[in-house]
Design a protein with these regions (language model features):
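A conserved ligand/cofactor-binding region detector
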Residues: 1-199
């Protein structure tokens, strides 16, 4: 903090000495009608009784940290360069709010792809996805995983009604507060601009 204000500094966690392992696994993500390629990074995390868990992280290879000026001021509309620079960017203007929609969709789309791939590898036929995965949605930020999973299942040839049923059996939702300001609501034109494939 300086002068009563929070100051953020970049954290170069994806440098050559990072514990995050770059993989060859990539997924297509469409934002505002433009195709992007997300890359999976795996980070080993110490777990219970000496076991190891894996934290899956996604990034764009096109991220450009040189666009950061004075703390976290950057061009919020340059998605290819800044999508994952700062999660939960300043949303006091429309560009910041739309960037949040892009970020949320980017994360849930990649997670949904990975969940489906891992279920298929373990023997799922996707009609039985709930036997292979449980998706716990905490608060509203990752809730776009629901329509995204439905969309991806339909792309794989599953009818909409069954895709909805599969996702209903796979997803659980917990909301930790009932305060109105904690419940995200996005104007429909944000979704039409950022993720029209979900509408």
């Amino acid at each position: 903090f300086a002068d009563g204000l929070q100051n953020e500094l970049p954290d170069p966690w994806l440098n050559e000495h990072s514990w995050a392992e770059k993989t060859d696994i990539t997924y297509p993500v469409t934002l505002a009608g433009k195709p992007y390629t997300a890359r999976l990074y795996k980070l080993a995390v110490t777990g219970y009784e000496g076991r190891t868990n894996t934290l899956n992280l996604f990034d764009l290879d096109t991220i450009d940290e040189s666009i950061v000026h004075d703390g976290i001021q950057f061009d919020k509309t340059a998605i290819a360069k800044n999508l994952t620079l700062f999660l939960y960017p300043d949303d006091s203007d429309e560009d910041g709010r739309i960037l949040r929609v892009y970020q949320q969709y980017f994360m849930v789309s990649n997670a949904a792809h990975l969940i489906l791939d891992e279920a298929l590898e373990r023997g799922s036929n996707l009609h039985d996805l709930a036997d292979y995965a449980t998706i716990q949605i905490n608060d509203t930020h990752p809730s776009m995983v629901i329509p995204e999973l439905i969309r991806l299942l339909m792309q794989k040839g599953i009818r909409m009604e069954e895709a909805i049923e599969i996702v209903t059996m796979t997803c659980a939702y917990t909301n930790h507060t009932i305060l109105a300001e904690a419940l995200e609501k996005w104007p429909i034109h944000y979704l039409q601009k950022a993720v029209p494939q979900l509408l």
